[in-house]
Amino acid sequence: MAQSPDGTGTAPVRITNSSTSVTSGIGVTQKLVGAAIAFGNVLRGTFGPNGLDKMLYKTNGEAAVTNDGAKIVAELLVKHPAAKAFVSLAESQENACGDGVTSCILLASELMSEAGRLLERGLHPLILVKGYEMALSQTLDELDSRSKPLGNNLEQVARTALVGRSTEGALDHLSKLCLLYTSDAADDSG
């Protein structure tokens, strides 16, 4: 049995490869925040009405051009734990809503960036989490207080959802069909 250099007991057992670097404390936080910011930067250029397409080279050698955040994230090969969390976040957003992946990732990236700044200034992580929870609660309350019934805007909502989905030639017809079927479904459900 190996003893520690001071003879007080067993020496620590090394469980990592000698070439593996081990980071702890603020170093881990900085790496996680840096990875979150980098992940957001991958999608930043595709965001908004002036967003640009990205050319992706897939592992099978094919190239794809898209500005769809979900498609871009699905093609990324990530190993970093923070990047894996962002891939999971993107998948959850896509599964729940079918859209909004880029916005979701950019928001999460900015929240992580701000969290990094606050942690560097000495804010305790539990206080940071509590603050984010309070901000979420206030945001949801504010959204509820400002929300209005859709009324006659449903057709415009359908048009907006269909834009960019290779439906431009039949946009008027499809948006009216969406309105008709959603109205029928609402009537059927009571």
Model feature map: region roles:
Residues 184-190:
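A short, hydrophobic C-terminal helix/tail in secreted or cell-surface proteins
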Residues 1-183:
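N-terminal glycine-/lysine-enriched basic segments
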